[in-house]
Swiss-Prot record:
Source species: Cricetulus griseus
Record keywords: Cell cycle, DNA damage, Growth arrest, Nucleus, Phosphoprotein
Family the UniProt entry places it in: Belongs to the GADD45 family.
Keyword Transferase set for record: no
Gene Ontology MF terms in the entry: kinase binding; promoter-specific chromatin binding; protein heterodimerization activity; protein homodimerization activity
Pfam entry (one): Ribosomal_L7Ae
InterPro entries the UniProt entry points to: GADD45, Ribosomal_eL30-like_sf, Ribosomal_eL8/eL30/eS12/Gad45
Protein name per its UniProtKB record: Growth arrest and DNA damage-inducible protein GADD45 alpha
GO aspect biological process, one term: centrosome cycle
Domain of life: Eukaryota
Positions bearing Phosphothreonine: T2
Biological role: Might affect PCNA interaction with some CDK (cell division protein kinase) complexes; stimulates DNA excision repair in vitro and inhibits entry of cells into S phase. In T-cells, functions as a regulator of p38 MAPKs by inhibiting p88 phosphorylation and activity.
Quaternary structure, from the entry: Interacts with AURKA, PCNA, GADD45GIP1 and MAPK14.
Length: 165
C-alpha cells in the first residue's frame, strides 16, 4: 500500500466515523422530539401517507437478515420509494448499536403480563421533520451532504457502521 492509498483509506475511515457520530446526534434529537418511526410496516404506512416530511430512512440488517428474502423485498421496495421521493437513505451495518441508541434503559422493561415483550422491529427507521420548526441541524445537514455525495458516486444506499461506545 502506498502512502497515498494509506492516506485516502485513513481519510475515509475518519469520514465514516464523523458520519456515524452525526447519525447518533440526529437520532438522539429525533428521539427526544418524537420524530422517529420504527419498523418496516410502520415506515411503509408513514411513507404512503406523508413522504414529504421524511428526511432520512435507515435500513438496518446484519448478516443473518441478509438471508431473509421477505425482508430484502421490503428493503428493495422502501429503497425504490425513497429514491423516487428524494428521501435520503442509509444502511446501518450494525443493528445492535442502532438498538442501543433507540431503546434506552427507560424504554426497556418487562411486559405487564409478566412475560418477555416482543422486541420492536428496528430494520427500518424513519426520521421526520418536526412540524413546529424546520430543522437547521448541522448533523442532519452533514448526513444529507454525505448521502448526496454518495449518490454522485453511484452509491445510492451508502452503508455506515455506527461507532461503538
Amino acid at each position: 500500500m502506498t502512502l497515498e492509498e494509506f492516506s485516502a483509506a485513513e481519510q475515509k475511515t475518519e469520514r465514516m466515523d464523523t458520519v456515524g457520530d452525526a447519525l447518533e446526534e440526529v437520532l438522539s434529537k429525533a428521539r427526544s422530539q418524537r420524530t422517529i418511526t420504527v419498523g418496516v410496516y410502520e415506515a411503509a404506512k408513514l411513507l404512503n401517507v406523508d413522504p414529504d416530511n421524511v428526511v432520512l430512512c435507515l435500513l438496518a440488517a446484519d448478516e443473518d437478515d441478509d438471508r431473509d428474502v421477505a425482508l430484502q423485498i421490503h428493503f428493495t421496495l422502501i429503497q425504490a420509494f425513497c429514491c423516487e421521493n428524494d428521501i435520503n437513505i442509509l444502511r446501518v451495518s450494525n443493528p445492535g448499536r442502532l438498538a442501543e441508541l433507540l431503546l434506552l434503559e427507560s424504554d426497556a422493561g418487562p411486559a405487564e403480563s409478566g412475560g418477555a415483550s416482543q422486541p420492536p422491529d428496528l430494520h427500518c427507521v424513519l426520521v421526520t421533520n418536526p412540524h413546529s420548526s424546520q430543522w437547521k441541524d448541522p448533523a442532519l445537514s452533514q448526513l444529507i451532504c454525505f448521502c448526496r455525495e454518495s449518490r454522485y458516486m453511484d452509491q445510492w444506499v451508502p452503508v455506515i457502521n455506527l461507532p461503538e461506545r
